[in-house]
């Protein structure tokens, strides 16, 4: 997206706007302890030197991010490419180590857990990746793909794993006979259902979905989003949804966070952000959404008929 907003203008409001008009990035969604709490999260990546005596430089992918998500709620993270969305997802999933800050899930600091503790904790949080073609191993049947999280936990027999896999496939709209098939035998939407089934099989409390429908046809996107909503209502799942598509966020999320250059610049409900955006970058995102204009009305033409005797 091409925006002509200066860095100084963006930095003028580096924290989300509350209903009172004040900036507040730490207000929880309700009075109960949040399921997920991110505090002053930062991630800096060093840049390679171009010559011997160049001082070390770094990219600040995330800078002081604070957010909370209540159990059973959906939080959308939106922003242009390079805004830090996927970096945030990797840190929440403990796939990367933060430069500073903390990620607490169910009261546990994920980045202070021992490897064995983290492996067991992963039962409570899973991820759905963007590409349903690249995230599924083409050499493995569906049963092995879906039961990978169970195998990582080191529990249950193969018969129990197959039974659980058949059950979770039915919950995402597939059949138990699909367990022995391979990814190439499915459409893109069906592959993403398999990816959702893999994330769902451990009954997680949190699912991080990184652009879960962006690689799908528009006609299939709504089906997958409706499935995610149904699963949330059935199992009380909490979603952290990473997306650049504002329509997707509006469809699924209770609250939205806008990221720009690694900082939160605005936060609110979809209704608040899409209809009463306060920050210029949020307005720029909204203005970049393609709109279908009504065709201009055709001019009225009078038709004269020649009468013949």
PLM regions with names:
Residues 101-109, 121:
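Conserved ABC transporter NBD signature motif
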Residues 182-186, 190:
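Conserved ABC ATPase signature
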Residues 93:
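Helix-to-loop junction immediately C-terminal to a conserved catalytic motif
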Residues 109, 160-177, 286-287:
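Conserved ABC ATPase "signature" region
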Residues 201-205:
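A short, proline-enriched helix->beta-strand linker immediately N-terminal to the Walker B motif
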Residues 3-15, 21-23, 28-34, 47-58, ...:
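Short catalytic/signature loops enriched in Gly
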